[in-house]
């Protein structure tokens, strides 16, 4: 299990006791402010604990949902538009408007981590919104995989999401032309 410094202080009540747990091998410091009771912890688990309000999006979400086999070089996370810059080199941060940030958020378990991630319906909207910023082959691969999943998706939810986002007409036209 992964602990933050705050959780360690609650459990062991002092820095001395935390260091004592580390020295005896009961606790391992993974990085500054992040501890674990096992020595091997995935980077995904560390990021999900270190940034609990962050939501996995774009390349990371496409990969975790099985829509592409391209493993992203960075963890793509969405944060509120007014959030501070995260200087973590492992992360690519997307600033999202507050009123649409939490639309379509769900949780997923990947190996030893429980992550907050956008659902497949939300990610279809994101794919269409950012299609000009993605490599064409990558876009077509993901779109083709969505066409294969069309009967598993909640079409009503997709239409609700499309109406909520900026430029709803453009999103609806792209859905009709390229997906349905």
Language model features: what each stretch is:
Residues 25-31:
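A short, conserved structural fragment
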């Amino acid at each position: 299990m992964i602990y933050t410094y705050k959780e360690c202080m609650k459990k062991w009540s002092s820095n001395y006791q935390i260091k004592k747990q580390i020295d005896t091998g009961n606790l391992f410091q993974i990085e500054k402010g992040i501890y674990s009771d096992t020595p091997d912890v995935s980077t995904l688990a560390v990021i999900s604990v270190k940034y609990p309000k962050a939501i996995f999006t774009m390349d990371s979400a496409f990969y975790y949902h099985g829509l592409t086999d391209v493993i992203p070089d960075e963890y793509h996370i969405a944060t509120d538009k007014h959030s501070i810059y995260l200087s973590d080199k492992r992360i690519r941060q997307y600033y999202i408007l507050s009123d649409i940030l939490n639309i379509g958020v769900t949780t997923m378990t990947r190996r030893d981590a429980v992550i907050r991630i956008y659902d497949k319906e939300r990610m279809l909207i994101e794919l269409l919104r950012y299609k000009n910023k993605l490599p064409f082959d990558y876009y077509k691969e993901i779109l083709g995989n969505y066409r294969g999943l069309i009967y598993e998706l909640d079409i009503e939810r997709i239409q609700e999401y499309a109406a909520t986002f900026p430029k709803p007409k453009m999103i609806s036209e792209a859905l009709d032309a390229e997906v349905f």
